[in-house]
Curated annotation (Swiss-Prot):
Domain S5 DRBM: 61-124
Taxonomic source organism: Pyrococcus horikoshii (strain ATCC 700860 / DSM 12428 / JCM 9974 / NBRC 100139 / OT-3)
Record has Repeat as a keyword: no
This protein's record includes keyword Ribonucleoprotein: yes
PANTHER family xrefs: 40S RIBOSOMAL PROTEIN S2 (PTHR13718:SF4), RIBOSOMAL S SUBUNIT (PTHR13718)
Entry protein name: Small ribosomal subunit protein uS5
Transmembrane segments: none
Gene: rps5
Length: 236
């Protein structure tokens, strides 16, 4: 974590008044690593938790506006126009979040979507599960995983180093934010539905956590959970 982001995290800590137990633990310095949150099974309900433990997701290059749509709703007083924004955030090293925000103005909807993406951040497993590579570096998924949303189904398959991301543009944005550099993919269903496709990719990444790995698999595929180079923020 760069010095600039450490200073940003300290400013957030100084101004933040936590409203949840987890927030208090972070504020008091009892939790200094985001991996600890997932290990203990806490639910993130305050975006400031991410601003402190994963401040680099606030960098412009670590945020993606995936889709902006205009929604019209008929009410007794006439038509009500609102914006719906789908956004993703990530540290490009094992953590990624996806969120949807609504608002009468596009700027408000974007800010809401980014905040919801922070609340929905997940920790993923990475590694080298490709039989063509076996470099044991965390550049791909360690094994094939599948995600589903609505009629859309996405399967991510380990790829060798240098392959790149063989998936649609929406999938590329989410995978890059998660720190995945090489992957094959198979897609099924109405993949032109941007929101469902994005959620299916996100769900596939989440499902890397559903596979129980053995010490032998960790050694063989170079499996890493979360950051490849763990760092933590402290008040000191």
């Amino acid at each position: 974590m760069s010095q600039d982001w450490k200073e940003y995290a300290k400013r957030v800590l100084d101004e933040w008044q936590p409203r949840t137990k987890l927030g208090m633990l972070v504020k008091e310095g009892q939790i200094t690593d985001i991996h600890e949150i997932f290990r203990r099974g806490y639910q993130i309900k305050e975006p400031e938790i991410i601003d402190v433990l994963l401040p680099e997701v606030n960098a412009r290059e670590n945020q993606e506006i995936i889709d902006i749509a205009l929604t019209v709703r008929m009410t007794d007083s006439g038509r009500r126009v609102r914006f719906r924004v789908l956004a993703a955030v990530g540290n490009r090293d094992g953590y990624v979040g996806l969120g949807i925000g609504h608002g009468r103005e596009v700027g408000i909807a974007i800010r809401k979507a980014i905040n919801y993406a922070k609340l929905n951040i997940i920790e993923i497993k990475r590694g080298c599960g490709s039989w063509e590579c076996r470099c044991r570096r965390p550049h791909s998924v360690p094994f094939a995983v599948e995600g589903k949303e609505g009629s859309v189904r996405v399967r991510l398959i380990p790829g060798p180093r240098g392959l790149g991301l063989v998936i649609g543009d929406v999938g590329k944005k989410i995978l890059r934010l998660a720190g995945i550099q090489d992957v094959w993919s198979q897609t099924f269903g109405e993949t032109r539905t941007t929101v469902n496709f994005a959620k299916a990719v996100f769900n596939a990444l989440y499902n890397t956590n559903r596979v129980v790995v053995t010490p032998e698999m960790i050694e063989r595929y170079g499996i890493v959970v979360g950051r490849a180079m763990p760092t933590s923020f402290t008040l000191e």
